[in-house]
Amino acid sequence: MAESAQLDIPRLLSRQPTRWLAFGGTVVAVLAMAGWAVATETGVNQVMAGLVVAATVVAVAAVVWRRTWLDTGDGTLHHRVAFLPERRVAWAQATTVDLERNRAGQLALRARGERGTVRVTLLADDLGGERSAGPDLLRVLADEIDRWAPERQRLTSRLRAQADHVEAGGAPRESPLARHL
């Protein structure tokens, strides 16, 4: 049996501080207004303000508390968001392993199986700026797909080409995967 290791897959987040400041400012403003309403209003308005606070906390938890990881021992890709059930897909049993664009400037590796669909964002050119997954992650994904689903060589060659491009310092917008955006 292969030695099992869990590899955390980092999220491809915006590098622009203004995006994070805007997000944080919005959350603080919503909580401040709802808190003021809870403190000063009565009846239904107070209940609604309390619900806004609760909904905001849940939404922030869903954005912040998410994890995607790869178990190299059994070739399984896992994804968990806040309190929702975990989704996992084994490379060998996946019905689909391919690239998927979201029509908003992001390209993800999508693995679909019986227990759900897991996506790993590989490339983005959107409001958050240009960014690509790192070469080490791209190569690990390619190696794991080759190990568990060797019939997917076309996809793994694309991942390796992207890894070489990123490692050479190439711009995400000019990368091999950029034509799929």
Q: What residues fall within each predicted segment?
A:
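N-terminal membrane-targeting/pre-transmembrane regions
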Residues: M1-T40, V166-L181
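Generic recognition of long tandem-repeat/solenoid scaffolds
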Residues: L7, L12, L77-H79, L109-A111
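Hydrophobic alpha-helical transmembrane segments
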Residues: L21-A22, T40-A54
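Flexible, glycine- and charge-enriched loops at secondary-structure boundaries
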Residues: Q46-V47, R87, R131
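Short leucine-rich amphipathic alpha-helices used at interfaces
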Residues: M48, D71, A171-E174
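Conserved beta-hairpin
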Residues: L51-D98
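Acidic, Ser/Thr-rich low-complexity segments on the non-lumenal side of membrane proteins
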Residues: E86-A124
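A membrane-cytosol interface segment of integral membrane proteins
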Residues: R112-E174
